[in-house]
């Protein structure tokens, strides 16, 4: 998947590094042990169409680019004429396709009440 910010096209990668970056910020700590909870934390926000969550997910998925836009540039991209509803849809579909997020997405889809907003 690609997005265009400030006339430059960037790749998005929803692989292991993406998960590591999410897990570094979204985790549960029990008895001094941190357990990554990144994907589980952001998917409900994507389903409910939370723009701040979408911005965070896009920013972390941009890790694959040598020169990636700043979080502020991603925010501005979303605030402009971007078809944000389509972008939510596309990101959720990509998360279902990625080899490293597919199983978690399947489990989340089965457990969350509003999963009809995630297309097959």
Describe the residue ranges of each PLM region:
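Charged interaction scaffolds used for protein-protein
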Residues: 1-9, 31-44, 64-120
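Short, surface-exposed, low-complexity cationic segments
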Residues: 16-39
């Amino acid at each position: 998947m690609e997005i265009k910010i400030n006339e430059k096209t960037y790749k998005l990668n929803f692989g292991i590094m993406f998960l590591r970056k999410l897990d570094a910020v979204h985790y549960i700590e029990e008895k001094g042990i941190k357990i990554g909870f990144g994907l589980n934390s952001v998917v409900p926000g994507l389903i409910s169409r939370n723009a701040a969550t979408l911005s965070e997910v896009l920013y972390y998925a941009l890790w694959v680019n040598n020169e990636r836009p700043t979080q502020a540039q991603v925010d501005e991209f979303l605030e402009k004429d971007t078809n944000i509803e389509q972008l939510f849809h596309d990101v959720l579909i990509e998360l279902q396709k990625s080899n490293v997020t597919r199983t978690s997405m399947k489990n989340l889809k089965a457990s969350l009440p509003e999963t009809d907003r995630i297309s097959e």
